């Protein structure tokens, strides 16, 4: 019986922590992103809202909310990677930072 209680407690902990992780991703709302695994010259920076934000919150993506400054332009960015690995979004605080990075990467194609 104690083993069942322990398993139940672990299950409840996992279920309760999932919404908290999704809520953490709300910091991405209103930021700007592009998929750098595609051709940057064909991509556009898009605002992280609605369906894209919902995708980031789902199990389709894994997001690293720690800002990294190892981008081509030197701007700080967060990343959300598709579980399948085909897409990886660089997420910037401003449209200008997003466009600068996209253009820098496009010039290196």
Language-model segments: which ranges?
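Post-signal/leader-peptide non-cytosolic segments of secretory proteins
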Residues: 23-109
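N-terminal signal peptide c-region/cleavage motif recognized by signal peptidases
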Residues: 17-19
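Bacterial N-terminal signal peptides that target proteins for export
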Residues: 1-8
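Hydrophobic helical h-region of N-terminal Sec-dependent signal peptides
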Residues: 8-14
């Amino acid at each position: 019986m104690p083993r069942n209680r322990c398993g139940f407690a672990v299950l409840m902990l996992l279920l309760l922590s999932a919404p908290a992780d999704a809520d953490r991703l709300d910091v991405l709302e209103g930021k700007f992103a592009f998929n750098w695994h595609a051709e940057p010259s064909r991509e556009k920076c898009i605002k992280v809202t609605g369906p894209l934000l919902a995708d980031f919150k789902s199990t389709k993506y894994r997001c690293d909310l720690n800002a990294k400054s190892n981008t081509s332009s030197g701007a700080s960015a967060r990343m959300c990677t598709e579980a399948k690995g085909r897409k990886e979004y660089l997420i910037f605080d401003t449209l200008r930072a997003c466009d600068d990075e996209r253009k820098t990467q496009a010039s290196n194609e």
